[in-house]
């Protein structure tokens, strides 16, 4: 039997031998494509090439692309585990031509691979083509030898592909395999008539040959392209002669492992058990790959999809008897089985397991409470002969207990109920609207639109700041505060200035924009910030201090040297810190965000738990070691692929052009970075971590200072240390020991004070019996014990109860603005009074509440002035 791993290997090798570049799978997070939540097809990483916006060194490529389809038009989540073909995560095998070969070679390659490499029987293969694609039909007949009776013409819905309403598009051909009459859905089963599994589509060949205009007209592309896709899971099932993708070797290892954990059997127990095992197998793959690609559980965007998958898989595990944390084990099984083909799984193995386990434990705390609420709702609906779970109930389950809507749907549907999804969505939208109303925006969308308009007008600027802090330039655009173009900015006016070239670094990559001055023949302005809306546009935020600035005039731009150097120092230390964290904590550490300014640096990174003091010190020492080694930095421009092969770290979520700048500290760090840096690490001087904290699940944050800022902070803390040493009458080097000694002395004194207080209270207690009164035939002792703590109060009450064999006792101790109260009732009076019943009304008089057993109750209050009123209330209750 041919394995899925072998199919993947054969596919890539086949196309490599036919002149294709084997390109690694891109991340599940699309690079610089806001239209996509996840990479969902092989062509996504080549989209800019197809659009003519990017060129690469090769014109033929082949990949095995990681894909995820959850949400949007590809929302198959409810079908996953219940059908033979639906998945969240899958691999797409594909070959691509960028203006190189076209239909004839694409058809030849595909037919050769499936009939010669995979040895699928030709007589069982059928082809669908676009209804007007006469060329494709002739080629399938002449190149592949497919007879006309096995070629079907279908419409645009089935056999025409487009990237969107406009842009590259073209007809496609699909290869189908006949799996046998026993797979038919009925007597009318056939290609183009149904979607059953008898005639199963296994490969789609897209011939991008047109450019579609907004009005729908199509013109031929000058360089037609090829984009093909074949699902690995599907072709593996076909080659292994199994009827379901879940029965191929890609899934069986996970299904069998989970079945063993749960003590159940696949295909032998119930269909519900089989569904649960398939869901867990599918979701475990998606979860492992998502975390390996830097996605972490959260309540929005990609992170929420991950959280949904973890929680959905976890609930299905509970349905087959799994308890505690178990999903992290199935995710580790994914690493074991697929880490060879995808090394990122191995690199993030431990981190991934910890993230999943923490999320499991978090959900487990609320799962039972949420299920109880839903069960109560379903019971109430049954009693009312209703079958729809209200939207507000579904929303409460989501908002309070963390139940994704699909989990509520799963449970409700299984019991014969539906869910008011419209009501749920309305409440979700109201919540989002409230959040938006609470946020005061800054007009970022207006800025972005205006800057995009400048780019479309051909306005661009060149950055020369790596080598110069001052440059002569020409003003090519001026905008007022309202973002409208102006010919001049007068004194006192604020606005935006764009020049042909500039030494000012625009905010990007976490580094803040430069500040400085702009001086022309007619005026001068302070540059308060520099923006970088795109790689080709740098915008100075200015405030004119004297005269006026005019469009199309010469201008001298000068960066503030001190601030630039301070920012460069912090940026270089950010790179050193990143490397140090990976060395101390492990290779799972990845940058999750940063802020680099002249005064400090902030670095967010993936790590599941708080750093220990020892780890923080180790990181600090490592950074300072690199600084004191005074290593010269290197920076060079090269192709992105070459940089990655060189070991440069591409930071998660960052956009990179085809040519990138690589900043390296030899022997320590290599990163893709466009920021400004020191010439050598020694210029940083020193490094000091000021805080380490958590900012999200699995994300930690370090804040630090460098150079003189670090020295000043050290000197300040040293002065404070000397001051503390003086206060505790010790030396700076002995402070820890001296403080421990003082703490021990304080504990001893506290115990002595408690003992004295207890003795005093006990003495007071012995005298209290003289204060016993009688109310309505019942003995009552109501007394206050000044200076007694709770422990002493209890000891006195025990003494009083031993002496007052029948009666009620109420003792009160006041500690500042806090009031402690105890009420005891002897057993023979329980038919008339109980301690909890008495204390409920009495404690209200001291601004508190309490409870307890029939014989003893306690309360706390905040109104010492109400003590006598409380005693009077007790007498009144007993006398009634």
From Swiss-Prot:
Binds 1 zinc ion per subunit. Its cofactor is Zn(2+). One of its GO terms (cellular component) is cytosol. InterPro entries: aa-tRNA-synth_II/BPL/LPL, Ala-tRNA-lgiase_IIc, Ala-tRNA-ligase_IIc_anticod-bd, Ala-tRNA-synth_IIc_core, Ala-tRNA-synth_IIc_N, Ala-tRNA_ligase, Ala_tRNA_ligase_euk/bac, DHHA1_dom. It is found in: Cytoplasm. SUPFAM superfamilies: Class II aaRS and biotin synthetases, Putative anticodon-binding domain of alanyl-tRNA synthetase (AlaRS), ThrRS/AlaRS common domain, Translation proteins. It catalyses: tRNA(Ala) + L-alanine + ATP = L-alanyl-tRNA(Ala) + AMP + diphosphate. Its main location: cytoplasm. Keywords: Aminoacyl-tRNA synthetase, ATP-binding, Cytoplasm, Ligase, Metal-binding, Nucleotide-binding, Protein biosynthesis, RNA-binding, tRNA-binding, Zinc. Its EC number is 6.1.1.7. GO terms for biological process: alanyl-tRNA aminoacylation; negative regulation of DNA-templated transcription. One of its GO terms (molecular function) is aminoacyl-tRNA deacylase activity. It holds the Pfam family tRNA_SAD. Zn(2+) binds at residues 571, 575, 673, 677. Consists of three domains; the N-terminal catalytic domain, the editing domain and the C-terminal C-Ala domain. The editing domain removes incorrectly charged amino acids, while the C-Ala domain, along with tRNA(Ala), serves as a bridge to cooperatively bring together the editing and aminoacylation centers thus stimulating deacylation of misacylated tRNAs. This is Alanine--tRNA ligase. The lineage of its organism: Bacteria, Pseudomonadati, Thermodesulfobacteriota, Desulfovibrionia, Desulfovibrionales.
């Amino acid at each position: 039997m041919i394995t899925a791993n072998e199919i993947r290997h054969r596919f890539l090798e086949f196309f490599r031998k036919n002149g294709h570049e084997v390109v690694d799978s891109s991340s599940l997070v699309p690079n610089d494509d806001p239209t996509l939540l996840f990479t969902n097809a092989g062509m996504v990483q080549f989209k800019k090439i197809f659009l003519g916006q990017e060129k690469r060194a090769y014109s033929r490529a082949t990949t095995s692309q990681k894909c995820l389809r959850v949400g949007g038009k590809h929302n198959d989540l409810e079908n996953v585990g219940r059908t033979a073909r639906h998945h969240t995560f899958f691999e797409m095998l594909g070959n691509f031509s960028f203006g190189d070969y076209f239909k004839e070679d694409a058809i030849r390659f595909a037919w050769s691979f499936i009939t010669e490499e995979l040895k699928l029987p030709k007589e069982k293969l059928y082809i669908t083509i676009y209804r007007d694609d006469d060329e494709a039909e002739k080629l399938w007949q002449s190149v592949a030898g497919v007879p006309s009776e096995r070629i079907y013409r279908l419409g645009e819905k089935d056999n025409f592909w487009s990237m969107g309403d406009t842009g590259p598009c073209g007809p496609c051909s699909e290869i189908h395999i006949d799996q046998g009459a026993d797979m038919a859905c009925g007597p009318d089963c056939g290609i183009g008539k149904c979607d059953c599994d008898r005639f199963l589509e296994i490969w789609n060949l897209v011939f991008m040959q047109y450019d579609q205009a907004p009005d729908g007209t199509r013109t031929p592309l000058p360089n037609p392209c090829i984009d093909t896709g074949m699902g690995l899971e599907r072709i593996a099932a076909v080659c292994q002669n199994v009827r379901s993708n879940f029965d191929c070797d890609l899934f069986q290892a996970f299904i069998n492992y989970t079945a063993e954990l749960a003590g159940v059997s696949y295909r032998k127990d119930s269909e519900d058990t089989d569904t649960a095992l398939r869901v867990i197998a599918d979701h475990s793959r998606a979860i492992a790959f998502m975390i390996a690609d830097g996605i972490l559980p959260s309540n929005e965007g990609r992170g929420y999809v991950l959280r949904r998958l973890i929680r959905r898989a976890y609930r299905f595990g509970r349905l087959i008897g799994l308890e505690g944390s178990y999903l992290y084990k199935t995710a580790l099984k994914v690493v074991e089985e697929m880490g060879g083909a995808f090394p990122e799984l191995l690199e993030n193995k431990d981190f991934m397991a910890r993230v999943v386990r923490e999320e499991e434990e978090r959900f487990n705390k609320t799962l039972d409470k949420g299920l109880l609420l839903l069960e109560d709702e379903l019971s109430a609906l049954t009693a009312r002969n209703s079958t729809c779970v209200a939207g507000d109930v579904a929303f409460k389950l989501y908002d309070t207990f963390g139940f994704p809507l699909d989990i509520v749907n799963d449970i409700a549907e299984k019991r014969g109920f539906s869910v008011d999804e419209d009501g749920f969505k309305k409440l979700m939208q109201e919540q989002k609207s409230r959040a938006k109303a609470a946020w005061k925006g800054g007009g970022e969308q207006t800025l972005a639109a205006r800057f995009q308009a400048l780019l479309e007008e051909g306005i661009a600027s060149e950055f020369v700041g790596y080598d110069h802090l001052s440059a002569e330039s020409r003003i090519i655009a001026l905008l007022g505060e309202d973002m409208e173009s102006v010919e001049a900015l007068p004194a006192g006016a604020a606005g935006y200035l764009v020049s042909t070239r500039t030494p000012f670094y625009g905010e990007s990559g976490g580094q803040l924009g430069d500040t400085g001055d702009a001086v022309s023949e007619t005026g001068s302005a302070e540059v308060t910030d520099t923006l970088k809306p795109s790689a080709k546009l740098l915008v100075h935020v200015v405030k004119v201090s004297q005269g006026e600035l005019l469009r199309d005039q010469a201008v001298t731009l000068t960066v503030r040297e001190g601030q630039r150097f301070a920012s460069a120092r912090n940026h270089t230390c950010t790179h050193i810190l990143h490397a140090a964290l990976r060395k101390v904590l492990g290779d799972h550490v990845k940058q999750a965000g940063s802020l680099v300014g002249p005064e400090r640096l902030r670095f967010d990174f993936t790590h599941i738990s708080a750093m220990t003091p020892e780890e923080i010190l180790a990181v600090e020492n490592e950074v300072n070691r690199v600084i004191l080694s005074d290593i010269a930095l290197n920076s060079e421009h090269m192709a992105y692929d070459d940089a990655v092969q060189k070991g440069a770290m591409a930071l998660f979520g960052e956009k990179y052009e085809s040519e990138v700048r690589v900043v390296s500290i030899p022997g320590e760090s290599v990163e893709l970075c466009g920021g400004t840096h020191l010439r050598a690490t020694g210029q940083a001087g020193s490094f000091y971590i000021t805080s380490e904290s958590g900012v999200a699940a699995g994300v930690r944050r370090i804040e630090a200072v460098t150079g003189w800022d670090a020295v000043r902070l050290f000197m300040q803390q040293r002065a404070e240390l000397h001051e503390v040493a003086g206060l505790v009458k010790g030396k700076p080097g002995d402070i820890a020991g001296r403080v421990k000694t003082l703490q021990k002395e304080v504990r001893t004194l506290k115990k002595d004070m408690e003992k004295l207080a207890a003795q005093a209270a006990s003495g007071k207690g012995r005298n209290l019996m003289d204060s016993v009164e009688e109310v309505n035939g019942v003995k009552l002792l109501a007394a206050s014990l000044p200076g007694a703590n709770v422990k002493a109060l209890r000891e006195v009450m025990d003494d009083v109860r031993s002496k007052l064999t029948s009666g009620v006792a109420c003792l009160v101790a006041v500690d500042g603005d806090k009031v402690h109260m105890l009420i005891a009732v002897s057993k023979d009076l329980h038919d008339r009074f109980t301690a909890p019943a008495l204390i409920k009304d009495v404690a209200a008089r001291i601004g508190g509440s309490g409870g307890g057993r029939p014989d003893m109750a306690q309360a706390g209050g905040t109104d010492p002035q109400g003590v006598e009123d409380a005693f009077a209330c007790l007498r009144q209750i007993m006398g009634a």
